[in-house]
């Protein structure tokens, strides 16, 4: 689990194949750090906020993402974590960031799925039969601006604004990032 949290903040996990930590997986780039984070997570009674706070207050996380030619020559893939990574956000986080920076993000937690704005007709023809056609009940008011975590998903298709979303047919722990 801590590998996934690391991946969330650094773009790549301490074990590159975040969905597979078995014997056939990639080796950890920093095995001692991974073990220490896992032990800390356990010792803190699986407190996610504690681990996330630990990561974002670390000197490694707080480094600049500017890379000089000399550093790039020594460590081109940043395996040594000598600078902060640059990576694109997955679409749900991108939407949330846009809402937060505009002051529109509704911070309400929990509750039923919400139906934020979707272009008209985007769900047309996605049902197996006409009798099962789906009418998208677009939310009103503050529910339009809830976090993407609460956005309604059909089993067969992701919301239109979640571009490059993985299929719901299989479990995916590493979101694809749009270039």
Regions found by a protein language model. Give the residues of each.
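Primarily short, surface-exposed interaction patches in extracytoplasmic proteins
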Residues: 1-145, 156, 160-179
């Amino acid at each position: 689990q801590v590998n996934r949290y690391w991946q969330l903040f650094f773009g790549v996990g301490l074990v590159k194949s975040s969905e597979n930590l078995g014997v056939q997986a990639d080796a950890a780039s920093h095995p001692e750090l991974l073990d220490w984070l896992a032990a800390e997570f356990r010792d803190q009674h699986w407190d996610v906020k504690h681990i996330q706070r630990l990561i974002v207050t670390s000197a490694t996380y707080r480094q600049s993402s500017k890379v000089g030619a000399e550093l790039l020559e020594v460590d081109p893939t940043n395996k040594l974590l000598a600078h902060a990574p640059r990576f694109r956000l997955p679409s749900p986080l991108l939407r949330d960031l846009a809402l937060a920076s505009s002051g529109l993000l509704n911070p309400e937690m929990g509750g039923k799925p919400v139906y934020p704005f979707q272009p008209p007709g985007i769900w047309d023809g996605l049902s197996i039969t006409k009798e099962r056609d789906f009418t998208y009940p677009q939310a009103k008011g503050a529910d339009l601006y809830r976090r993407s975590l609460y956005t309604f998903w059909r089993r067969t298709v992701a919301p239109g604004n979640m571009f490059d979303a993985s299929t719901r047919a299989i479990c995916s722990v590493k979101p694809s990032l749009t270039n």
